[in-house]
Amino acid sequence: MERENLKSRLGFILLSAGCAIGIGNVWKFPYMAGQGGGGAFVLFYLIFLVLLGLPIMTMEFAVGRASKKSPVKAYQALEKPGQKWHIHGYFTLAGCYLLMMFYTTVAGWMLHYFYMTATGKLSGLSADAVADQFTRMLADPGVMMFWMVLVVVIGVVICAGGLQNGLERVTKVMMIALLAIMVVLAINSFFMAGAKEGLKFYLVPDFGRMQGVGVVSTLVGAMNQAFFTLSLGIGAMAIFGSYIGKDHSLMGESVRVVVLDTFVAITAGLIIFPACFTYGVDQTSGPSLIFITLPNIFANMPYGRLWGSLFFLFMAFAALSTVLAVFENIICCGMELTGASRRKSSLVNLFLIIALSVPCVLGYNVWSWDGFAVFGGAVLDFEDFLVSNLFLPLGSLVYLLFCVTRYGWGWENYKTEVNTGKGLKVHDWMRGYLTCGLPLIVIFIFLFGIYDKFFK
């Protein structure tokens, strides 16, 4: 079967950025930046992004482009005879399924709230009534199931339409719209009464506030966010590397993807902080920020229905862009493992992903009795822990060791692949850090995640 390729360089960059850009850019990064000293946190975040995320992204892209295979088959094309690196390929596929087991539900929340806001169902509600809307949604398995299934159907239908005519075409439009909506929302925030105070809190470095939270805690938080924001370790980037030519170096392309992801994360704060300071609302993180705090602000804002609708449309696009990217990975792996057509692989995965996503939906209602808990939390929290604290760091470590050590693909092969084409290059002076320093940092992130979950 002849391998498909992306039609344009822009399509590759937007698809890769769409995979990296997700809800964490909005409901986690601004809060961490605000609490961690504003500009001080942002500065350290950018440093760690360059030191951690960027190199590993080049490695995923390199494995994909050199092999021209899906992640589940890529190692077999590059490893030496008798080696077992290809076992990790199956773990990348498992990680993608696990991510979709809860991400489809969260993406459904975004679509639900876009509908609720656009139709005016949240207009004029009191703060308690807005909070109650979120609680009622979680308690209703029918509503949760409907939106989750809709997300899966949308994702599979688009991917089944083909790489160029389906995934690439839709993602281009969606990502450009996402960026445009963000800019409009940010400009609107600049004209709010509390914009000056909010932007000062967010962007001006405040090392005193950083010390109040704890310097070590803030640095580890910046390191974790820089590492996890790019969705590395489960082959989600490698698949797009397999769809491109060798006209441009992979370091240069990775920089462009990282810049887009960072733009979205920082711009999210430009939207949120002025609004919170204008309306005297404590800035929180996670679902409470998105589904309680901000809807309350929109309810009291002039033209709040318009701005709220735009915000949740942006959030829906951010979630769907990740869903589409991971679906493409899953569907392509299915095609290569079974020899099935794109449409057949899409159809099988439509039902499989819906079935796998049901526990997350029911974990908030039907299965939410006191005796049912996974490590003391909801099903979503457990699935998120497995992906974020196991599959991403350990998967990234495998890609890293495969690319830079003589026991895998090897430094010279990696360097040759990543440097092919015009653009920024990887140099030999980086080898010591990538071979010795970076693996230790990734191991630290993994161990800290385990400690933070079970022993803190």
Language model features by range: what are they?
Residues 1-27, 56-61, 65-78, 82-87, ...:
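Membrane-interface "cap" regions at the ends of multi-pass membrane proteins
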Residues 2-6, 168, 172-320, 324, ...:
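Membrane-embedded translocation segments of transport machinery
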Residues 3, 73, 107-139, 243-247, ...:
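Helix-loop-helix connectors at the membrane interface of multi-pass transporters/channels
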Residues 3-4, 32-36, 66-91, 104-164, ...:
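Inter-helical loop and helix-membrane interface segments of multi-pass membrane transporters/permeases
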Residues 5, 11-13, 19, 145-146, ...:
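Loop-to-transmembrane helix boundary motifs in multi-pass membrane proteins
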Residues 5-16, 41-44, 84-97, 145-151, ...:
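Select transmembrane alpha-helical segments in multipass membrane proteins
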Residues 11-48, 197, 235-241, 251-255, ...:
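Transmembrane helix-boundary motif of multi-pass solute transporters/channels
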Residues 88-93, 338-350, 382-442:
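C-terminal membrane-solvent junction of multi-pass transporters and transport-like membrane proteins
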